[in-house]
Design a protein with these regions (language model features):
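His-Asp-centered metal-binding catalytic motifs of divalent-metal-dependent phosphohydrolases/nucleases
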Residues: 90, 106-126, 131-135, 155-164, ...
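Alpha-helix N-cap/helix-initiation sites
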Residues: 80-87, 104-110, 128-129, 148-151
Length: 245
C-alpha cells in the first residue's frame, strides 16, 4: 500500500491523531494559527469532523481512493519540502476544496493529477518560477489519459502554479484552451491547495493570498495536518509510531 493510501485511509476513517493547537505554540520551529484566533479575526474554520462529514459521501472521495493506488511515487521529487509528504497534504486539500466548490468528477480528475505532479519539474527547494514549465515537459505519461483540451488544461495549470496571477491569461492563450473559465477555476484550487501547505515553510499562512472562500476555512486544519503528518528528515524514523498511536 502506498503512502498516499495509508494516510488517506486514516484521514477518511476519522482516525488521525491531531494535537491540540494553541496560538503561538511552536512545533518544529513553526508558529501556527489556532482556530480560535482565526475565527476571532472573522475567518470561520472547518474542523476535522466537519471535513469528514462533507466529503465522506462524495463521489470525488471515491475516485481519489481509487486513483491514488495508481500513483508511481518514484515520479515525485525526493525532497523534505516538496516531496511525497507535501503532495499527500496538498492532494487532500484539493479533494476538500473540490467538494466544497461543487466541482464535477471530470474536472476533479484534472485537478487531482495537476496537484500530484505539479512539482515534478523541481531540481531543488528554492524559489523557481520555471519549475512549473519544466514539469510540463515530463507529463507525456498522462497524454493518453485525456483529450487534447483536458491535457492542455493540466499543462496550463502546472506551468502557471509557480507564476504570479498576472501571468495566468498569457499562459492560458499559449495552450489555446477553449474552456478558459474552467481552467482558471482549477488553477485557483491548485494554487490555494499549494498555499495551504506553506505552513511548512513560513511562520504562518497569510490568508489574504488565498483565492477562494473555501480555502480560508481550512487554514486551522492545514496547521493541524502539517503538525500531525510531516515526513520531515528531523523525525522521519519515528513518524509511523506518532501517526498510528
Amino acid at each position: 500500500m502506498s503512502e498516499f493510501e495509508l494516510i488517506f485511509n486514516k484521514f477518511r476513517n476519522n482516525k488521525m491523531v491531531f494535537n491540540k493547537i494553541k496560538e503561538g505554540t511552536k512545533y518544529y520551529n513553526y508558529y501556527v494559527l489556532s482556530k480560535e484566533k482565526l475565527e476571532k479575526e472573522g475567518y470561520n474554520q472547518l474542523s476535522y469532523s466537519d471535513i469528514i462529514n462533507i466529503i465522506q459521501s462524495s463521489n470525488l472521495s471515491k475516485y481519489y481512493c481509487n486513483h491514488i493506488k495508481q500513483i508511481n511515487e518514484k515520479l515525485i521529487v525526493d525532497s523534505d519540502v516538496h516531496g511525497v509528504s507535501h503532495i499527500v497534504r496538498a492532494s487532500i486539500y484539493v479533494l476538500i476544496l473540490s467538494v466544497l466548490e461543487n466541482m464535477s468528477l471530470e474536472d476533479f480528475k484534472l485537478t487531482l493529477d495537476s496537484i500530484i505532479y505539479h512539482d515534478i519539474g523541481r531540481v531543488n527547494d528554492i524559489d523557481d518560477e520555471m519549475h512549473g514549465y519544466n514539469a510540463t515537459k515530463k507529463l507525456g505519461f498522462l497524454e493518453n489519459n485525456y483529450n487534447i483540451e483536458d491535457f492542455n488544461t493540466i499543462k496550463f495549470v502546472i506551468e502557471s502554479h509557480s507564476l504570479d496571477d498576472n501571468k495566468d491569461y498569457e499562459i492560458l492563450k499559449k495552450y489555446d484552451i477553449i474552456k478558459e473559465n474552467r481552467a482558471l477555476r482549477i488553477l485557483k484550487i491548485i494554487k490555494d491547495a499549494d498555499a495551504l501547505d506553506r505552513v511548512r515553510e513560513y511562520p504562518y499562512l497569510n490568508i489574504k493570498y488565498l483565492r477562494t472562500d473555501s480555502s480560508k476555512k481550512l487554514v486551522s486544519f492545514s496547521c493541524e495536518l502539517f503538525n500531525s503528518y510531516n515526513v520531515n528528515s528531523r523525525w522521519k524514523n519515528d513518524w509511523w509510531s506518532f501517526w498510528y498511536k
